[in-house]
Every structure is written in C-alpha cells, then in structure tokens.
C-alpha cells in the first residue's frame, strides 16, 4: 500500500533507465518512426520501467510473450471475438513505489504495476484503465487495449495497487485497499500523459478513462474527482459504492443465503437480481457470490467474522470460492458507523465533470443493474449532471462475456456495444455529436452479436 521509503527517486530513475526487455525474436529493427524517441521516455515516479520495441502491441502479436497474460483475460470476452492486429510500437512495463507484493507478474512480486503502450501511428489520444475484479494490468488487453491501439490511441493500465483474492490485506485501515485503486489510477494517468509527451513531442490532445466492473467504478470515480485529467469516459458495469447502500454488501448476502438454502428467489428479486437471470445463478453460486461477498466485507468490515476469510481467502480454488456461512445473515445497514465511514471513503456521488457513457447488462448476476447502474444514473441526475451522462441497458448482457459461449441462445456479449459506445463518446467529445438518449439496446434475433452492436438499435425502448 505505502510507497517504499529510502529509495531516492533519482536512483530509481537511473535504475529504470538502465533496464530494457530483450527484444522479441520477431521484432523489426528500430528505424524511422518505429519506436522513435524510445530512449527519451521516462515514466515519472516509476521505481522501475522496462521498454520493448515490438512489431505488434496487440494480443495477437504478444501471445506467448511476457508482454501480456492471456490467463488473466479468461472469461472476459466471447470466444469468437475478433480483434485487430499489426500495431507496432513501444511497450513500457514497470511499477511505482509500493510496499505490498500481491502481483507476481514478471517475477517482480511488487504491486502498483502498470503497462503503457505507445503505437508508432498515434492519433493524439490516450486511453487509461484499471483492472476489473481483482485481476492485474493485462486483464483488458483483448477487451480494450487491442481496439484502442488499432485506432491509434496510446494505452495505459494499472493493477490498481493490489490484486488477487487477498487484496483486502493491503493497507492498515478498512477501505485502504480500494482507496489505493483510485490513487493509483490518478497516478498512472498523470505519468502516462507525460510519457506520451516524451514519445510524441506533445501531450495527448484527448484523454479517456474507461473500464470494466471495478474498472468501471474507477471510471466513475475519476470523472467525479479528477475531471481535469480526462475528456470523457465509458463505464462498463461499474461497481457501485455508497455509504448507506445500495452496494455489493447489500445484495450479495442474500445471494450467499440462497446458496446456503436460507433465501428464496423472491428474496433475490427484492435486492435487485433480475427475473430471467435465474439460469445464471448456479454458476455464480460456484464462481462469484461467496468469494466476492467475503473479500469485500473483509475490506470494509474486518471485525465481522474475523476468522472467515481471516488472513487469507484460501490457498485452493475451492477454499477461495467458498462462502463464509456468517455472510448469509450479514446486515450492512445494521453494521457500526465505522463500517459505513470506511465505505464513504471510496463512495461515488454522481457528480461527474466530464461526459460519461454507462453500459450494463440486464442479466448481470453479480452486480444487478437495479442495485447498481440504475441507481448511479439517478445519482447523476440528482446531482444535476444528467446532460453529461448516457446510460444503455444491454438486453441479454451479463457480467462477463465469456458466458455467451455457454448460453448463446440467451445472452449477447457486451463488448461490441462497448466499442460502439466508445466511438459515440469520441464523437460526443470531439465533434459535439450527442449520443442516443438512454435506452435498452435490444438483443437482435439474428446477425453477428459477437462483433457488432448498434447503440441506436431500432428495437430500443426508453429507460
């Protein structure tokens, strides 16, 4: 959590400058504009940075190399998703000073890791994101990085300063780990903007914030708290934190109770889970509900059942995913004021200062939209920022697109709608073209739902 003390910045910078990744075996020799000014790029504040001049910065070109991690991307996209390739440029991996060690990528055992990708053919923009869930900096390479790089954007992603199921152990006070997510995202944005200027000769003309799930939360938080850094953002099913609820800790206990046989379907509907999403519940019982409730409850309310999860969420997959029985009766509203204050430290307000597009699937069975983005949209409206917000419900969308492969007759991937939303945001910001009004994007009865999505679908209905 805390920056490492006792390492002078000048020494850290010299160390960073002295290191470089070995060039990829198939990398073209640097020349002309390929990786120009590579030797001038320094990531401000980084304790370590390693640069590599690569023939392709997309997941197609990086597969099997140290420059991406396909395992950390698992489940986020549908199997048939088409991605662009052939984007040469410079990749910088590194980390900022930090005293926690959850992230073992590159064998560093050091948190606050980041990746910055600088394509040779730059369009003048920068896209920043934070990892979804408790994943790490390469998690959205296929979902986000590939497409924006192909469009000419520089790209930067952070591991948020902690990762993995034991992330809640980071810090000294309840809420510290998640508060660090926000600080690390701001830190990387500022540093990436300067790195971009060093590489291309001027600062980015546009900077966009975006992300999935916890990355969507970060997008909301950044546009509320640091609008000066960004020109807009796309929020893909961002997690909602509010001090008095709703939040994850007001809906997931009921899901845990149902898993353990002490809650009914009607109880699930009452806390926001959608009718029609029941076919997804058995999977979420095994993969999401128990672990998500216990680790986020441990982050904000460690005094409740301190032995579960305790010092670790578990050492095996079964132990990590298993629910804590006491979570079935967890009552966030009745918890001490200190718990609500811990959540308040990272809570959202709806007071966005830049244009924001939110997407949320109507069959999300982890963060049900009725207890999340529906509420956030009302918060934005109540704060007087409604003109800066668009909210699209994706019919047939769920929390991770990978489930489409199991239920292609019931679901649709959100990624193609996300790509359309990003294009709409850019047109909104740069051309003044307002996106369609809030509506539900209907699931088409045919066609290519894996790689196409029209936000202005004629089958849309008003929110």
Where is each model-derived feature located?
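Accessory cap/linker subdomain of secreted extracellular hydrolases
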Residues: 31-104, 109-112, 238-351, 440, ...
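Proline/glycine-enriched tight loop/beta-turn segments at coil->beta junctions
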Residues: 108-113, 119-126, 204, 351-353
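Primarily recognizes the serine-hydrolase "nucleophile elbow" in alpha/beta-hydrolase
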Residues: 136, 206-255
């Amino acid at each position: 959590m805390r920056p490492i003390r006792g390492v002078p910045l000048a020494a850290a910078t010299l160390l960073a400058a002295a290191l470089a990744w070995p060039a990829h075996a198939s990398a073209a020799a640097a020349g002309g504009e390929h990786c120009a000014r590579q030797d001038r790029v320094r990531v401000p504040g980084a304790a370590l940075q390693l640069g590599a001049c690569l023939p392709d910065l997309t997941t197609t070109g990086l597969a099997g190399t140290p420059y991406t991690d396909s395992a950390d991307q698992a489940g986020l996209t549908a199997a048939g998703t088409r991605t662009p390739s052939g984007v040469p440029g410079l990749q910088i991996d590194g980390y900022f000073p930090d005293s926690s060690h959850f992230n073992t990528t590159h064998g560093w055992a050091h948190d606050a890791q980041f990746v910055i990708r600088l394509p040779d053919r730059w369009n003048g923009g920068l896209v920043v994101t934070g990892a979804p869930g408790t994943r790490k900096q390469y998690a959205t390479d296929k979902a986000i990085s590939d497409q924006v790089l192909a469009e000419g954007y520089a790209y930067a992603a952070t591991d948020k300063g902690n990762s993995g199921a034991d992330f809640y152990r980071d810090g000294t006070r309840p809420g510290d780990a998640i508060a660090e997510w926000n600080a690390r995202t701001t830190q990387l944005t500022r540093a990436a903007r300067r790195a971009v200027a060093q590489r291309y000769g001027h600062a980015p003309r546009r900077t966009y914030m975006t992300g999935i799930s916890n990355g969507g939360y970060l997008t909301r938080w950044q546009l509320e708290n640091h609008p000066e850094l960004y020109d807009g953002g796309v929020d893909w099913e961002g997690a909602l934190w509010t001090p008095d609820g709703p939040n994850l800790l007001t809906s997931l206990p009921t899901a845990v109770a149902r898993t353990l046989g002490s809650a009914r379907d009607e109880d699930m509907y009452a806390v926001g889970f959608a009718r029609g999403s029941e076919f997804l519940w058995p999977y979420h019982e095994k993969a999401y509900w128990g672990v998500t409730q216990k680790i986020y409850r441990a982050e904000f309310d460690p005094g409740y059942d301190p032995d579960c999860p305790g010092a670790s969420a578990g050492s095996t997959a079964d132990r990590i995913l298993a629910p804590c029985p006491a979570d079935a009766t967890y009552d966030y509203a009745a918890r001490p004021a200190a718990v609500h204050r811990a959540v308040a430290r990272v809570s959202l307000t709806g007071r966005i200062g830049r244009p924001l597009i939110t997407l949320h699937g109507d069959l999300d069975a982890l963060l049900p939209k009725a207890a999340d983005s529906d509420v956030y949209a009302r918060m934005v409206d109540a704060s007087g920022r409604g003109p800066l917000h668009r909210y699209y419900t994706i019919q047939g969308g769920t929390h991770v697109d990978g489930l489409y492969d199991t239920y292609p007759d019931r679901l649709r991937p959100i990624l193609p709608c996300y790509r359309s939303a990003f294009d709409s945001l850019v047109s909104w910001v740069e051309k003044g073209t307002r996106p369609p009004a809030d509506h539900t994007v209907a699931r088409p009865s045919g066609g290519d739902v894996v790689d196409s999505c029209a936000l202005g679908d004629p089958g849309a209905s008003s929110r």
